[in-house]
Regions:
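Terminal alpha-helical segments
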Residues: 1-118
C-alpha cells in the first residue's frame, strides 16, 4: 500500500511532466494527455489526504469517490473532482475532441484541488 510520501512523489513527478515543453499549452496538441496527467495529479493529492486523515489507500476510482464523499476535508472538492474524473474518461476512452479550453479548465480545477488539499 503506497504511503503519503509515495503519493507526494508521484504527484510531483506528474506535475513536473506538465511543465515540460511536450505538454505546454501554447505548443502542444496533446490536450487529452494534459487532462489525463492533471487527473492523476489530483488522484495522488487525494490519496495523500486519505492516507493522512484515515491511513487509507483507495482500491479503485469508485472506492476513491466514496472516500471523498465520506471524508470531511475532501467533501468540498467532490464536485470538481468528479467533473475532472469525467473529463479524464472523455479524454482517455471516448476519443472525443479535447480542446485547449478543456485542458485549461482541468488545470484550473487542479489548482483548486491543490489549494483544498495542500
Amino acid at each position: 500500500m503506497p504511503k503519503k510520501v509515495d503519493h507526494d512523489n508521484q504527484y510531483k513527478s506528474n506535475k513536473a511532466l506538465l511543465k515540460t515543453s511536450t505538454f505546454d499549452l501554447t505548443s502542444t496538441k496533446h490536450y487529452d494527455w494534459v487532462i489525463t496527467i492533471v487527473f492523476y495529479c489530483a488522484v495522488h493529492l487525494i490519496e495523500m489526504e486519505l492516507d493522512g486523515c484515515k491511513n487509507y489507500d483507495s482500491i479503485d476510482h469508485y472506492d476513491r469517490k466514496l472516500q471523498i464523499l465520506s471524508t470531511k476535508s475532501l467533501r468540498p472538492i467532490s464536485k470538481i473532482y468528479l467533473a475532472l474524473y469525467i473529463e479524464s474518461m472523455r479524454a482517455r476512452y471516448k476519443c472525443e475532441n479535447i480542446t485547449r479550453d478543456d485542458a485549461e479548465k482541468a488545470l484550473r480545477t487542479l489548482v483548486s484541488i491543490e489549494k483544498a488539499v495542500c
